[in-house]
Amino acid sequence: MAADDARTVEVDGREVHVSRPDKVYFPALGATKFDLVSYYLAIGDHLRGTAGGRPAMLQRFPDGATGKSFYQKRIPAGAPDWLQSTVVATPNGTTSNALVVADLAHVVWAVNVGCIGLHLWPYLAADPEHADELRIDLDPTAGIGFPEVRAAALCCRALLEELGIEGHPKTTGNKGLHIYVRLAPQWDSFAVRAAVVALARELERRHPDLITAAWWKEERGARVFVDFNQNAPHKTVFGAWFARPRTGGQVSTPLHWDEVETVVPDELTIRTVPELVRRRGDPWGDMAARPQSLEPLLAMAAADRDAGLPDAPWPPQYPKMPGEPPRVAPSRARKAPEGG
């Protein structure tokens, strides 16, 4: 495509260059790079409400959703000087200068460099010490379909309501569901992870045939896994309203709870979501106005510790944590020699 086929978008007081706008990004949908830009412009107010002010990790797809990708925490060289950034860290202490989703112009810039959606930190760049989101990732294991994930989400809602905590569901844009809890910014990510470990364990106790808190895949069986480690410090999660790198342009879409029982996630795409929002509004529109307390879940975590339960295993890239059991799959631990 010739260079003069590029387009310029005026958004949030900026002129953002979009190169190769007619490149097909989602073949099954017949949707282009500029269709993706247009989608984000259409739902911009809602996207600002969930992503605004958060650091973001870039995942770049130069050839669209079906092509190869690479992750990039650092803003690339040659980026415009108006981009806002903040310093983020990895579990081993390495720092990067990451993009901050300061406004919609930053999202359009990210699309232009090949991002389809963004992976967001659970805190605002202005307050990196305090997570203001708890993220419950309901992950289907092998042999599990969306009906089981749906059932697990409703079980999770019931437990949260019992604890006086308001949760907000969304599709992942793929096979699972997320439930977000907007928190008062009073706790760090270590506390949030501990809270979700306790939640996962209690859900497994109540629904052992449906839900598992087992970190090791060999122990999960055909159950829905509550991935508590998505709340570990420095972890990012794919943000609400962003399109996934799937050929059909599926979107990670916030839902009302009554929609969980009937939603068909693959039908929620960059073509259908704007009209859906116009018709029934933004289910997460007032979430930030009602921040929740983590204390009921932390009390549950304390009760587990008092009962002798150790911490749950951490991902391999994290240093060994106090109270963590041996970081080895149970089958391997059983095979280890007893002698020195």
Q: What annotation goes with each model-predicted range?
A:
Residues A2-D12, L41-A142, F146, R150, ...:
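SsDNA-processing nucleotidyl-transfer enzymes
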Residues Q59-F61, G167-G173, A214-E218:
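Short beta-strand
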Residues P147, K170, L183-P185:
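Nucleic-acid 5′ end/cap handling module spanning
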Residues Y39, F146-I165, V192-P208:
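Long, well-ordered alpha-helical scaffolding segments within enzyme catalytic domains
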Residues M1-G30, V37, R48, G52, ...:
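C-terminal accessory nucleic-acid interaction domains of nucleic acid-metabolism proteins
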Residues Y180-R193:
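Catalytic palm subdomain of template-directed nucleic-acid polymerases
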Residues W121-A125, I165-T171:
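Catalytic micro-motifs at enzyme active sites that drive phosphoryl/nucleotidyl and oxygen chemistry
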Residues T171-V181:
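Short, conserved phosphate-binding/catalytic loop or strand-edge motifs used
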